[in-house]
Amino acid sequence: MSKTPSNPALSQRSDMVVFLNGEYIPADQARVGIATHALSYGTGCFEGIRAYYNSERDQLYVFRALEHFQRLKRSCKIMNIDLPYTPEELVEQLVELLRRNDFHENCYIRPFAYKSDEIIGVKLNDLTDHYTMFAMPMGDYISTAGLRCLVSSWRRVDDNMIPARAKISGAYVNSAFAKSEALMNGCDEAIMLTAEGHVSEGSAENIFLVVGNEMITPPPSENILQGITRDTVMELARRELEMLTRERVIDRTELYTADEIFLTGTGAQIAPVVEVDHRSIGTGVVGKVGGSLMSLYGDIVRGRREEYMHWLTPVFDKKPAASNGSNGHVASNGLNGSNGAKTKRGKQTTEA
């Protein structure tokens, strides 16, 4: 079993600042009641966003921030949650949060919109909606040295049960069952099938197979999250490797005969798979395509490829430009009622 990095925790620093209901407050003052609807029923939706530190430029770059918040808005629409900010405003809030925490290391951001009433009863309508966001240092979420995977006995929930195109908090118990099964059986990660027995995705990652000179991946109709890293990899494969990606139904046994397999996700980044169900994939080591994409991705997210800078939002630039269409304005004196000044904190200069 390959070594899996330890899980990050918000408590790694005592001076963390979070965003809650329009204000930036100390993390230890952010409280949610024990009867909160979302805590009992999973009635919330979230995003996972990464920011990468470039020590040469002393700059922190948020990767594809606008696209993440556009997806969050879509998730909120499905969940009947009123999120009263535009995606561009949400990017501004994120940048301000990172500035206030003065991160000089790779980090992970978790925006979360949820049903906040403290009541008993299963419904989505006529409830109060709240929004929060926090950030924490984060290196590798799962190993990138080569994963051993298990095809899970737990099937991916269907769109007419809990829609996978929305990042719904309650839906992730499905992933937790699958991931725990894999870990308890000596593997690193789970691969989940649909109810029909087709390949869907990992516990929290999209999946790609390399077969000959093409990549294949399950289509959205196979109950996958339409991942932003997935979209990134498809574009990079086309532009940089001259490889097309075909979206199609994939049978379980195709996993065993693939030349390469890798998982993609904001947390996972690009994680090669070297074994599935005790069968070596390809030569049993990280493959050429996966390795090339990992290297390319690592440079892009740290601002080392100028042609992809439109995907990045710099945090410490005085005039940062949010990715793909944001007006780039960031309020330095707080947003939505907060007037707290930024506190300078000690730098940590680690790169994953």
List the model feature ranges, each with a label:
Residues L90-Y108, F112-I119:
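Short, acidic/charged, Gly/Pro-enriched secondary-structure junctions
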Residues M1-Y85, E89-E96, I119-A352:
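Helix-start/capping segments and mature chain N-termini
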